[in-house]
Curated annotation (Swiss-Prot):
Glycans are attached at N256. The keyword Heme applies. It comes from Mus musculus (Mouse). The record marks L325, R326 as: Cleavage. Residues 229-258, 326-358, 412-433 are vesicular. Pfam families: F420_oxidored, Ferric_reduct. It catalyses: 2 Fe(2+) + NADP(+) + H(+) = 2 Fe(3+) + NADPH; 2 Cu(+) + NADP(+) + H(+) = 2 Cu(2+) + NADPH. The chain crosses the membrane at residues 208-228, 259-279, 305-325, 359-379, 391-411, 434-454. This is Metalloreductase STEAP3. It is linked to Defects in Steap3 are the cause of fragile-red phenotype characterized by hypochromic microcytic anemia. Highly expressed in fetal liver (the site of midgestational hematopoiesis). The lineage of its organism: Eukaryota, Metazoa, Chordata, Craniata, Vertebrata.
Amino acid sequence: MSGEMDKPLISRRLVDSDGSLAEVPKEAPKVGILGSGDFARSLATRLVGSGFSVVVGSRNPKRTAGLFPSLAQVTFQEEAVSSPEVIFVAVFREHYSSLCSLADQLAGKILVDVSNPTEKEHLQHRQSNAEYLASLFPACTVVKAFNVISAWALQAGPRDGNRQVLICSDQPEAKRTISEMARAMGFTPLDMGSLASAREVEAIPLRLLPSWKVPTLLALGLFVCFYTYNFIRDVLQPYIRKDENKFYKMPLSVVNTTLPCVAYVLLSLVYLPGVLAAALQLRRGTKYQRFPDWLDHWLQHRKQIGLLSFFFAMLHALYSFCLPLRRSHRYDLVNLAVKQVLANKSRLWVEEEVWRMEIYLSLGVLALGMLSLLAVTSLPSIANSLNWKEFSFVQSTLGFVALILSTMHTLTYGWTRAFEENHYKFYLPPTFTLTLLLPCVIILAKGLFLLPCLSRRLTKIRRGWEKDGAVKFMLPGDHTQGEKTSHV
């Protein structure tokens, strides 16, 4: 009975990368860490929690001992590197030379470089940090790993941070050892090849949303253009022509007029490249020729453009809710009531305007709901739970429905304003007429592609048929047309 009571309540088991429990070896290898910064402390915490024996080497162990877990041994650097076979080098590149005095003790051991250069250092040095470390310690095996994992992710665990650990080294056995450690810590190792790949791996943390740069600049450019256009029509024109001060509209009213224009055009730009790609395939008669680079990049940025469209649409909805809260709106209501009294009208009701408002608000809510569905299904956790047909239906079919609803929302908002002369201020057409051009072209093109003569040809091309091919090809059930040829 006493023997049972001496057993620990929690066994030395770890959560593996797939969520299952993985056994740690009974005699876990001793791991050394050189450095006492934030990353070194987080790494030590994670290693201790995973059942490893951790020795931390510091220049001043008495000062830094209280910052590390109690189970981690904090000592001088010479003692920390004496027994472990795997040593994490958690110091900056400029401090590598201070470790040269340990070269004899480090010989034959695995050095794991976890550092990242600054943008200036990355451009200045041709060698990666890991390659530079390997040149200083030729008798050691250098592995680049854990540099894309943040200190917070190490402390919080892989469930709340990035799970992938990118690993590169010239020695397969060393990569295997570090991969096993990463799995024991609950992460997913990913082999990136030899140590020559370390420069590319070190560049990853330096990137700031690379796939969002062009879509964001596009959205900002559209916002500036539409805001300037609306400012000229709604603020500048009344000031010049009628001497009316409408500058109070700039912070909210003009912004709210601009937001739906940007959202609508961005949504159109999500589906325009698909139309261009289909037209190009029909013209070429094959799918095996590459698209132009500009079209290829455009197709790859559709997700980001769509999410920005949803963002601007949500802002438009929030701004619209704020419109009745403005002091200027309250003054307009009072002035309208005074005019009604002076005109001796007991009831003001315009049936056409009432119906128009009800319809276009309803269509706007439906369009925003569709965009919300598209945004949710673009999340990796949701997208991974859908098969390709389900994902394609939501993003392609329902997305096109959202474009149609947005077009109907815009048309009912504009109503007959496009044909009324007083709405052409400075001879500039209403803003909504400009936004309608591109979506209407896309909807018309999509409708043309649904015609049997184009639809069947496009389907054949995407199944491998070629206009000037050499292999007989016929779609299932296509008995009425002659045989075609293909290189399938």
